[in-house]
Amino acid sequence: MAKKSKNLRAALEKIDSTKAYSVEEAVALAKETNFAKFDATVEVSYNLNIDVKKADQQIRGAMVLPAGTGKTSRVLVFARGAKAEEAKAAGADFVGEDDLVAKIQGGWLDFDVVIATPDMMALVGRLGRVLGPRNLMPNPKTGTVTMDVAKAVEESKGGKITYRADKAGNVQALIGKVSFDDAKLVDNFKAFNDVIVKAKPATAKGTYITNLSITTTQGVGIKVDPNSL
């Protein structure tokens, strides 16, 4: 604990908490101040001036990062017949129907992404209380309820991330790993920022992005100037 506190203090000393850094500076500083002993995840966090209670100000979706995520996702697909075979051929880790529902109801959760064909959603609905709180419930807005299961599996395996604004207007997303080149992290950050900017509700008032930061697993938050993106 003492060593962790020492590392944290050392990291904080390198950061000017009153400054909003450019995206390039922030990425470099996030890597420099990372003290995790493993290949830490790099994440960005937005606070948006939106009211998610209003239907037209809810922000949710998915995208494929240009440089990938550095993470291998375990993909589960609910499908039958030809669509099940397509999912398997595309590289899905788990494919099934009632058997998977029973397994999940029994406490099994060794997967990161859940995809389903539309005709399977009545079955998947039984898992709402398990998958919903973990943001694993398939949804058309994130491309995880689809007949094109092969594409969905390939995207999930190839750098797809999902995002959603919480009740306070916060949106968080991973943009890669500390081991990534700075340029790849910057590219991913800019690509995600473009999606967030384009998602601005027409009815949103005032400054849209009120706070933006980048951090690593166990790292400290570094303010980013939205105008640098």
Curated annotation (Swiss-Prot):
Q: Does the keyword Repressor apply?
A: yes
- Superkingdom is Bacteria
Q: Which GO terms describe its biological process?
A: regulation of translation; translation
Q: Which GO terms describe its cellular component?
A: large ribosomal subunit
Gene3D superfamilies listed in its UniProt record: 3.30.190.20, 3.40.50.790
* CDD domains in the record: Ribosomal_L1
Instruction: Report keywords, A-Z.
Output: Repressor, Ribonucleoprotein, Ribosomal protein, RNA-binding, rRNA-binding, Translation regulation, tRNA-binding
Identify the InterPro entries for this entry: Ribosom_uL1_bac-type, Ribosomal_uL1, Ribosomal_uL1-like, Ribosomal_uL1/biogenesis, Ribosomal_uL1_3-a/b-sand, Ribosomal_uL1_CS
Classification via Pfam families: Ribosomal_L1 (PF00687)
Which Gene Ontology molecular function entries are recorded, alphabetically? rRNA binding; structural constituent of ribosome; tRNA binding
Check the record and name the NCBIfam families matching this protein. Answer: rplA_bact
**What function is annotated for this protein?**
Binds directly to 23S rRNA. The L1 stalk is quite mobile in the ribosome, and is involved in E site tRNA release. Protein L1 is also a translational repressor protein, it controls the translation of the L11 operon by binding to its mRNA.
Q: Which family is annotated?
A: Belongs to the universal ribosomal protein uL1 family.
Q: Which PANTHER family match?
A: 54S RIBOSOMAL PROTEIN L1, MITOCHONDRIAL, LARGE RIBOSOMAL SUBUNIT PROTEIN UL1M
User: Tell me, how does this one assemble?
Assistant: Part of the 50S ribosomal subunit.
- Name assigned to this protein: Large ribosomal subunit protein uL1
Q: Which organism is it from?
A: Streptococcus agalactiae serotype V (strain ATCC BAA-611 / 2603 V/R)
Lineage runs:
Bacteria, Bacillati, Bacillota, Bacilli, Lactobacillales
**Protein encoded by which gene:** rplA
